[in-house]
Amino acid sequence: NQGRYDRSAYPRNGMRIARKLGVVTYRSAMEWDGRFGRVRLNSEVASERFGMEFEVESYLEAHADRFVDQFDPNCYLYLSRAMDWFDVCQSCARDGDDVVGALATFPLQNALVLGATTDILFPLHQQQQIADGLARGGAKTRFLALDSHQGHDAFLVDIDKFAPPIRQFLDELRKTP
């Protein structure tokens, strides 16, 4: 419907599925297993063949329900498209796949690049590429791979691991003339 919708034509199912997929990819397998494992909602009752059976399903349903009413579908589409189209190499008019070379053109003096070991959306090898590129451009760069079970969401929720290196980096910047 070309992005035109009202409550009668609202893309509810698509939004719910998008949110569930997002939530699953923001977290790590270790977190899902530690949090939910294979715990059933009600182990005493025989479940429907394709009904909601596990606690993790209930959790994802609740996230999807909240998301549908709080996020505009067109905003979600534009945000998703912007992420798909972003290409640091293209924006620097450099060789099509030379990420390190493109980042070397950024005029930075200092950089801190943090990655979570369990982040599948921005894996450590990509974070290392960022650090390598910034360093090649002359930035005093520090790269840290932080061990976290939180996946992509680690930078939002694993404050005990992310705050100290950020604090140290900012303190060092304040001391630099």
Descriptions of predicted regions:
Residues N1-R66:
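Alpha/beta-hydrolase-fold enzymes
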Residues A62-H63, Y78-L103:
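Active-site nucleophile elbow and catalytic-triad environment of alpha/beta-hydrolase enzymes
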Residues R66, M83-F86, T117-F122:
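Acidic catalytic loop of the alpha/beta-hydrolase fold
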Residues S91-V99, N110-A111, P123-G133:
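Short alpha-helix in the alpha/beta-hydrolase fold that links the catalytic acid
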Residues L103-L108, L134-G137:
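Short, conserved loop/helix-junction motifs that constitute active-site signature segments
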Residues V113-G115:
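Short beta-strand/loop motif that positions the catalytic acidic residue
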Residues Q128-P177:
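Catalytic active-site module of serine/aspartate enzymes centered on a nucleophile-bearing elbow/loop
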